[in-house]
C-alpha cells in the first residue's frame, strides 16, 4: 500500500508511562526546521557565530551548538552536520523567523549563502532503528549521504533524515513496505526521546532567556572552551571559570490534567510555601495522565524538592536522574 506524505498520516502514538517505546517508528519532524550554509567561507563564518567548534567537525559526525546574542543568551540550540554541499543546521522551527536573520546579518561580507531549507525532516526511532539504517543505508560513520539528502545518527535509538521533498514519499513507502511493524508518529514521540535523553532545546517562547550552561549544553558537548572568539563568548566563559551560572536543566515528572506547554512556569516547594521554580523547555504527556518534562531550575536545589505546574497546582512533580553528569569535564 502506497502512503502519501501527509502530516495527517503521522499521529501521536498512545503510550502509558509504563509502556515500552515502539521498536520501530517513523516520525514526521514538522516542528523542526533546517538551515543550510553553502560557500567557501561557511566554516569560518559560522565559527565566529556559535559555541561549538565548527572547524573540528568531522565529515561523518554531528555536533550540538548554540547561537547567542552579545550577552550570551541563546537564540537557538542546533545540531550541525555536513549536508549536500555545505552544512545542515537543525533547530526548532519556531525560532527560525527570529534566528535566521541574525545568523545572516554579516553574511554579505563573506562567501556564504544561508537559507531556510525545504528539505523534509523525518526521524527513525526504536531498538530496531540502527539495523534498519544499516539495511537501507549501509556505510560508516554517524552522518551518511543518501539519495537526495543525509542520514544523521542522533543517539543509540534514533536517526534523522534530511531529504528532498520529492524523495521523502519514496523513503516512507520503502520503510513501510519493508518493515510491517513500523509505526508512523507525529513529532511528540521525538519530544519524548529528547526528554528521556535530556537533550536541550530552545523555542521562540524561551529564546534569549538562558545562557548555554543553564540548559546543560556543556554536558552534551555543545560548547568549545578552546576555540576563538564568537558572539556571547565572554558570558559563556565567565559561567565556566567564575561560576556565575546558577541554573541547570533537569528531568521532572508528575501528573497533568492538560498538556504542559513550553514556557510554562514550574513552582518549587519552600517549606510550606511555593515559589517560582523554573521554566519548562519540552514535555510529553502520556495517555494515562503522567507527564515528563525538561525544566530549567536553580542548580542548588535539594533532590527532595517537590514541584508543581503553576496552572495545575493540584499535582506534585518530582525530579528524575539525568542520563549524564553536570560536572565539568
UniProtKB/Swiss-Prot annotation:
Single Gene Ontology MF annotation: folic acid binding
Organism superkingdom: Bacteria
Q: Where in the cell?
A: Cytoplasm
Q: Which GO terms describe its biological process?
A: iron-sulfur cluster assembly; RNA modification; tRNA processing
Keywords attached to this Swiss-Prot or TrEMBL record, sorted alphabetically, are:
Cytoplasm, Folate-binding, tRNA processing
* InterPro entries, A to Z: GcvT/YgfZ_C, tRNA-modifying_YgfZ, YgfZ/GcvT, YgfZ/GcvT_CS, YgfZ_barrel
Functionally, this protein is described as follows: Folate-binding protein involved in regulating the level of ATP-DnaA and in the modification of some tRNAs. It is probably a key factor in regulatory networks that act via tRNA modification, such as initiation of chromosomal replication.
Could you identify this protein by its name? tRNA-modifying protein YgfZ
In its UniProt entry, the species of origin is given as Photobacterium profundum (strain SS9)
Amino acid at each position: 500500500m502506497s502512503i502519501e506524505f501527509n502530516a495527517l498520516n503521522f499521529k501521536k502514538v498512545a503510550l502509558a508511562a509504563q509502556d515500552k517505546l515502539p521498536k520501530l517508528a517513523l516520525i514526521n519532524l514538522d516542528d523542526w526546521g533546517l538551515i543550510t550554509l553553502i560557500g567557501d567561507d561557511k566554516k569560518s563564518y559560522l565559527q565566529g557565530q556559535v559555541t561549538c567548534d565548527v572547524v573540528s567537525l568531522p565529515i561523518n559526525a554531528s555536533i550540538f551548538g548554540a547561537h547567542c546574542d552579545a550577552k550570551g543568551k541563546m537564540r537557538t540550540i542546533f545540531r550541525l552536520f555536513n549536508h549536500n554541499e555545505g552544512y545542515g543546521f537543525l533547530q526548532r522551527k519556531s525560532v527560525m523567523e527570529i534566528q535566521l536573520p541574525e545568523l545572516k546579518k554579516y553574511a554579505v561580507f563573506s562567501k556564504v549563502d544561508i537559507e531556510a531549507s525545504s528539505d523534509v525532516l523525518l526521524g527513525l526511532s526504536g531498538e530496531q532503528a540502527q539495523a534498519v539504517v544499516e539495511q537501507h543505508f549501509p556505510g560508516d560513520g554517524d552522518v551518511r549521504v543518501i539519495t537526495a539528502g543525509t542520514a544523521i545518527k542522533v543517539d543509540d535509538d534514533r536517526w534523522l533524515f534530511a531529504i528532498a521533498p520529492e524523495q521523502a514519499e519514496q523513503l516512507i513507502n520503502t520503510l513501510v513496505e519493508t518493515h510491517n511493524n513500523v509505526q508512523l508518529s507525529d513529532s511528540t514521540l521525538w519530544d519524548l526521546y529528547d526528554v528521556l535523553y535530556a537533550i536541550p532545546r530552545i523555542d521562540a517562547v524561551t529564546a534569549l532567556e538562558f545562557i548555554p550552561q543553564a540548559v546543560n549544553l556543556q554536558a552534551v558537548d555543545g560548547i568549545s572552551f578552546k576555540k576563538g572568539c564568537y558572539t556571547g563568548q565572554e558570558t559563556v566563559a565567565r559561567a565556566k571559570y567564575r561560576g556565575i551560572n546558577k541554573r541547570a536543566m533537569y528531568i521532572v515528572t508528575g501528573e497533568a490534567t492538560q498538556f504542559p506547554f513550553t514556557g510554562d512556569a514550574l513552582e518549587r516547594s519552600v517549606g510550606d510555601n511555593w515559589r517560582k521554580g523554573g521554566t519548562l523547555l519540552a514535555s510529553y504527556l502520556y495517555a494515562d495522565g503522567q507527564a515528563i518534562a525538561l525544566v530549567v531550575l536553580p542548580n542548588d536545589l535539594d533532590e527532595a524538592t517537590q514541584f508543581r505546574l503553576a496552572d495545575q497546582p493540584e499535582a506534585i512533580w518530582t525530579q528524575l536522574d539525568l542520563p549524564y553528569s553536570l560536572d565539568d569535564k
